[in-house]
From Swiss-Prot:
Pfam families listed in its UniProt record: Pmp3
Cystine residue pairs: none
GO cellular component term, pick one: membrane
Protein name as annotated: UPF0057 membrane protein At4g30650
Signal peptide: none
Xref: PROSITE patterns: UPF0057 (PS01309)
Subcellular location: Membrane
Top-level taxon in the UniProt lineage: Eukaryota
Ranges annotated as spanning the membrane: 4-24, 37-57
Amino acid sequence: MASNMEVFCEILIAILLPPLGVCLKRGCCTVEFLICLVLTILGYIPGIIYALYVIVFQNREGSTELGAPLNSA
């Protein structure tokens, strides 16, 4: 699991240069990177939103916390 500082740095990079943030997280030859690049070219704000989505929400795919019950007895 990434530390809070790592996630903060990834989010900061995603806000400044959205395709770079996705490239560092997923790789440069991925569909996520190409989508982020196109969205950033068409409009800077959609690129930022998509980059944040990739970094924050797709980061938790392998996490067991997301689907775990609150009270496990």
